[in-house]
Each structure stands twice: as C-alpha cells, then as structure tokens.
C-alpha cells in the first residue's frame, strides 16, 4: 500500500508500506477520507514527530477483522466487514479514574493508543483498544463528513469548557446558549466550526480574522458581526454595551492573540486557549485585570468519546458538514497539494479522499 510520510512541513513523500498485521480484536480499514489537521501546519509540532505518516481525521470502510477477541464498540454494536466508520486515533480505557470523571485525554491508555500507520495511508489498522472511540457512520454521512468528526469533537469539548454550566458533559441541545455571548478569534476551519456549532446552540457570536473572505464565511454560518483584529476590542465593546464576551475562543497559538483574547473577555467570563503556543514561548498578562474581573483561563486539548459521539450527531443533523464548510477534496495521492493549500490558506479545509478499489476483489497491497 501507499502512504504519505511527512519529513517536514515542506517535505511530504508518498512511500510504499506493508499492510499492517492485525492482532486479536484489531480491524483493518480501507480509507475513504482523511482531513489535513490545522495542528499539522505548525512546524514545531511536526518536527518533534517527523518522519511519520500523518493524518488523524480519518473515515473509511472495514475490510477485515481479526475476531479472535470481541469486536464490540462502546455502544454494544459489533463491527463487521463493510461497516463505514470514523475511528479516533486515541481512545481511553473507560475504566480508570480519569475516564470515570470524563477526563479522557488524561487516561494512560488514551495517550498510548494510535492508528497504524496514520490516516494518510490507503489502509489503516485500528487496534482493539481504539474501538472504544470508533463510530459507525449513519447512512447519509459521507466519508468527507466523517473525517470532520475528530475536529468537530475538539470544538464540542472547547465549547463545553467555555460554558460548563450550560453545555455539561454530553447531549447538549439547541438553545442551550441563548442569551450568551461568544467571541471567536481566528476563522480557520476550527474557528468556523465554533461559529456554526455555537450558533446552533443559540449563542450570540462575534468573530475576528485578518481574512475578509473568512469573515464573510463566519457571517454566513451565523456570526452576528465580524471584525478585523485591529478594531476588534473596541468594536466588541460597542456591540455589547461594554460587557464584552461571556466566553472567548482563542484559535491562534500566539501571545498576541492571547492578549487580545484576555482584553475581550468580560466579567466572570472564560478564555479558552484552543491552540498551544510553541513550547518555551511565554505569554504575560495583567494578572490584576484578570483577577478583579473573575476571568477564567482554561485550555482545551483534543477530545474524548463523549465529544465524538455528539460531534457525529451534529454532523448527521447537518449543523456542520463538508458542504457547509465548503471543503476542498484532493484525491490520493495528492496529499502534498492538499497540505500546501491549507498552509497557504487557499482553502477553508482540505480533505484527502481515497478512490475505491475494486470492491469485488480481496484487498491487496497495490
């Protein structure tokens, strides 16, 4: 089989790799679509792992199972050849203290699990442990839509951390954020997903980005007003009568963006750090100003099974889809053009699709 191996942000190679060998309880998935993650655009993040087969936003079709061990998903369903699935690259044990408290990303099993070799390959081995966060795609949900489950799940978790009283841990419904104000900084695909989902929850949304076209997309998804970053603080203050935002999602991982986020978080509000700054870089702020406004600073890293389940539900309901986000599809092996289009911000979202093999034949290395 062929796989896209990332050696650096400007060095992606299509290489031959052997088919993964299935262990008891494992599943082999023929890829249908895999998204290019915004995180894989950060040089420091890529270089600490390279070389590696990247891609952790996958969806595909089960083509083989090793049923020496039970192939049961979290909801009790059994996987079978032909099932169309989303599979999370990390999955928790569901039994430790962290899992019982819903803090899945702090589960030791979650941090040790991975797909082999990665989503930008023609076939992927899903280890038995990862079945704890593997979901069967409903009819009508395309592979491109399925590849949005993981990034949207990160947004679900982010909004839960921004509004814990209103959204709780699972199953939040529309109108939960009626009367609440959200400010989204940065309108890449993750920022746009925040806008679309928060609008479905009934929030009043403001957003900012340097890119005027992205601001237009945000308004089409439900943002009430959008601003250029240079005018955002004053404009938000004017729009809210001085209250500023109940919650701010800071998308860019830069100290300057975080400073703007803090300045626009209202009294008793929450600033969500959605993207890390480069390790070793420092962010300083006026602690006194945050203290006397009762501002909460929280991080939101990745997601867990509660989030992926809700994300798939929102996708199936049409709240966030590949069509609504106007994603651009690139057929494998055009992985490097997909990556470069994302890096240059020429597209909102790049998704690599995998043309079907001959369904009448056994899967083979090609």
What are these regions (language model features)?
Residues 276-293:
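Rossmann-fold NAD(P)-binding glycine/threonine-rich loop
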Residues 191-192:
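N-terminal Rossmann-fold NAD(P) dinucleotide-binding loop
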Residues 84, 181, 269-270, 296:
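Short glycine-centered segments of the SAM/dcSAM-binding site in methyltransferase folds
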Residues 247, 259-263, 305-366:
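C-terminal hydrophobic helical "lid"/dimerization subdomain
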Residues 20-34, 47-97, 138:
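Glycine-rich beta-strand-centered segment in the early N-terminal region that forms part
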Residues 93-182:
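NAD(P)H dinucleotide-binding glycine-rich loop of Rossmann-like/cofactor-binding domains
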Residues 265-267:
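Helix-to-beta-strand junctions that scaffold the AdoMet/dcAdoMet cofactor pocket
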Residues 178-187, 197-260:
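Adenosine-nucleotide cofactor-binding segment
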């Amino acid at each position: 089989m062929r796989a896209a191996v990332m050696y650096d942000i400007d060095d992606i190679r299509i290489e031959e790799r052997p088919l993964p060998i299935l262990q008891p309880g494992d599943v082999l998935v023929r890829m249908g679509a895999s998204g290019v993650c915004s995180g894989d655009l950060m040089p420091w993040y890529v270089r600490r792992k390279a070389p590696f087969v990247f891609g952790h936003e996958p969806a595909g079709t089960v083509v083989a199972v090793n049923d020496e061990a039970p192939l049961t998903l979290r909801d009790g369903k059994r996987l079978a050849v032909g099932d169309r699935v989303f599979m999370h690259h990390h999955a928790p044990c569901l039994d430790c203290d962290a899992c019982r408290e819903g803090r899945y990303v702090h589960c030791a099993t979650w941090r040790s699990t991975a797909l082999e070799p990665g989503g930008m390959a023609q076939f992927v081995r899903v280890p038995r442990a990862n079945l704890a966060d593997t979901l069967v795609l409903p009819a009508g949900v395309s592979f491109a839509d399925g590849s949005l489950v993981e990034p949207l799940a990160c947004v679900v978790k982010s909004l839960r951390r921004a509004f814990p009283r209103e959204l709780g841990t699972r199953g939040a419904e529309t109108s939960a954020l009626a009367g609440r104000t959200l400010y989204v900084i940065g309108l890449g695909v993750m920022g746009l997903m925040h806008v679309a989902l928060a609008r479905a929850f009934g929030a009043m949304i403001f957003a900012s980005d340097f890119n005027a076209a992205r601001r237009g997309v945000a308004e089409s998804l439900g943002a009430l007003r959008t601003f250029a970053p240079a005018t955002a603080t004053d404009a938000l203050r004017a729009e809210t009568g001085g209250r500023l935002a109940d919650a701010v999602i800071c998308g860019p991982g830069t100290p300057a963006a975080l400073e703007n986020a803090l300045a626009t978080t209202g009294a008793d509000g929450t600033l969500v750090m959605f993207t890390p700054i480069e390790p070793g870089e420092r962010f300083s702020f006026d602690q006194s100003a945050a203290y006397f406004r009762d501002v909460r600073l929280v991080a939101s890293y990745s997601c867990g099974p509660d989030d992926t389940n809700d994300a798939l539900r929102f996708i199936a309901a049409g709240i966030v889809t590949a069509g609504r986000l106007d994603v651009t599809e690139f057929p494998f092996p055009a992985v490097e053009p997909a990556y470069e289009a994302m890096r240059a911000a020429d597209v909102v979202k790049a998704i690599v699709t995998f043309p079907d093999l001959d369904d009448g034949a056994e899967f083979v290395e090609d």
